[in-house]
């Protein structure tokens, strides 16, 4: 069974409850700051925490948002994860016609996942790839 929950603030406490003390203080601070700027969701498969993600709008009137995602390790149930991700991104694109973000160039699995979601990549800057996902009219 798949479920998605809106996560109460702060996200770092939620992750500690689900996965133990896996975040550094810097990571916890960054994620809590992202959480202050937008809503955060958590995905579960068979009641097991899989990942969390959120959107950070550029402003109150912005038509684009920054997508971030965190998981403790490799995602299992990949087909289910990709399909649910596609559904979630389509919902996000109803609110924000453009979604932007970054991933590591060395993370081939993240790039494949983002391509399944419709991401277009810009040339790499060091180990960072910028991506854009646009609403199709």
Label each PLM-derived region with a short phrase.
Residues 62-76, 129:
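Conserved acetyl-CoA binding element of GNAT-fold acetyltransferases
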Residues 32-36:
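Short loop/turn motifs at secondary-structure junctions and domain boundaries
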Residues 37-55:
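Conserved beta-hairpin
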Residues 53-62, 121-122:
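A conserved beta-strand-loop-helix scaffold within acyl/acetyltransferase catalytic domains
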Residues 127-137:
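C-terminal "cap" of GNAT-fold acetyltransferases
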Residues 77-91, 112, 116:
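Conserved acetyl-CoA-binding loop-helix of GNAT-fold acetyltransferases
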Residues 1-28:
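Short amphipathic alpha-helix that is part of the acyltransferase structural core
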Residues 96-115, 120, 125-127:
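Conserved beta-strand-loop-alpha-helix junction that forms the acyl-donor binding cleft
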């Amino acid at each position: 069974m798949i479920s998605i929950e809106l996560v109460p603030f702060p996200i770092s406490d939620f992750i500690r409850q689900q996965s133990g003390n896996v975040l550094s203080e810097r990571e916890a601070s960054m994620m809590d700051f992202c959480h202050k700027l937008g809503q955060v969701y958590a995905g579960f498969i068979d009641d097991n925490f899989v990942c969390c993600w959120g959107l950070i709008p550029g402003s109150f009137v912005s038509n684009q948002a920054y997508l971030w995602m965190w998981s403790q390790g490799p995602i299992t149930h990949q087909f289910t994860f990709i399909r649910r991700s596609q559904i979630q991104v389509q919902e996000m694109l109803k609110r924000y016609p453009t979604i932007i973000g970054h991933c590591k160039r060395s993370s081939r699995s993240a790039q494949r996942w983002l391509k399944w979601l419709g991401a277009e990549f810009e040339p790499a800057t060091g180990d960072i790839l910028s991506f854009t996902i646009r609403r199709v009219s």
